[in-house]
Design a protein with these regions (language model features):
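Middle-to-C-terminal accessory/interaction subdomains
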Residues: 1-52, 58-238
């Protein structure tokens, strides 16, 4: 079924509003939980490449008629980023704690990428105080569930465990690939896959935890809240 483009023009116009009008439109027309989940995930993996492109904007026209953002193209994540100073995407630089590019609000007008772009929809979400608070609370939940704090024992780290699983699964193919094609001829040409995995763990995951939990946590900038205690509910007792 063919649909026109009136709704996308409506969205583009609506997110230019301010204050109560903007808040009302976002709550009425956006799938708030889905968008917040999407944004929190991009912060954990430090995705700078989804700001001006590399995402789908989907409207459930036959259902709740709400918009949400869907991910696409995640090669420049987990520390990888476009480097305008040289090399483009072919560089070994790890982006993990350099603000504004590594800030939790990257993508709004005050936290642009190193390609000097920002996203008006993301900016609209963060300009509404209630939605911003919801985002930061959800970000903390995702951090605790997936990234985990810097104090987490190494044996309990989920990201690192998953990386190790993938290395074990892919190693035979990786060895064949490197034997045939060698190591890419940019950056550190001596870096093999094992070294790259070690860098991912020590230079991205470890430092990302510090940046989000400490630099921007309650004891740092105060932006990201502390974890909330789950209330104890006893059913069947009064």
């Amino acid at each position: 079924m063919w649909e026109g483009d009136a709704e996308i023009y409506e969205l583009a116009a609506a997110i230019q509003a301010t204050s109560v009008e903007l808040e009302r439109w976002l709550f009425d027309n956006m799938n708030i939980p889905a968008v917040l989940a999407y944004l929190a995930a991009t912060v954990v993996i430090n995705d700078n490449d989804h700001i001006a492109k590399n995402y789908y904007l989907y409207r459930d026209s036959d259902g709740d008629r709400e918009w949400e953002m869907l991910p696409w193209d995640k090669d420049l994540t987990l520390g990888r980023n476009f480097d305008p100073a040289g090399g483009g995407v072919l560089n070994d630089h790890i982006w993990v704690d350099q603000d504004p590019q590594s800030h939790p609000f990257v993508g709004d007008r005050n936290h642009i990428t190193n390609a000097s772009v920002w996203n008006r929809l993301i900016d609209a979400f963060y300009r509404v105080p209630r939605i911003q608070e919801m985002f930061l609370r959800h970000l903390r939940t995702v951090m605790d569930d997936a990234l985990q704090s810097p104090q987490t024992p190494a044996s309990e780290l989920k990201f690192e465990a998953r990386v190790d699983e993938l290395v074990t699964q892919c190693l035979p193919e990786l060895q064949l690939d490197q034997a045939k094609w060698g190591i890419p001829d940019y950056g550190d040409t001596s870096m093999d896959y094992a070294q790259a995995v070690a860098i991912l763990k020590s230079e991205y995951f470890a430092k990302r935890r510090i940046h989000l939990y400490e630099t921007h946590g309650a004891a740092g900038s105060g932006l990201i809240p502390n974890a909330q205690e789950f209330p104890y509910v006893s059913l069947g007792q009064i």
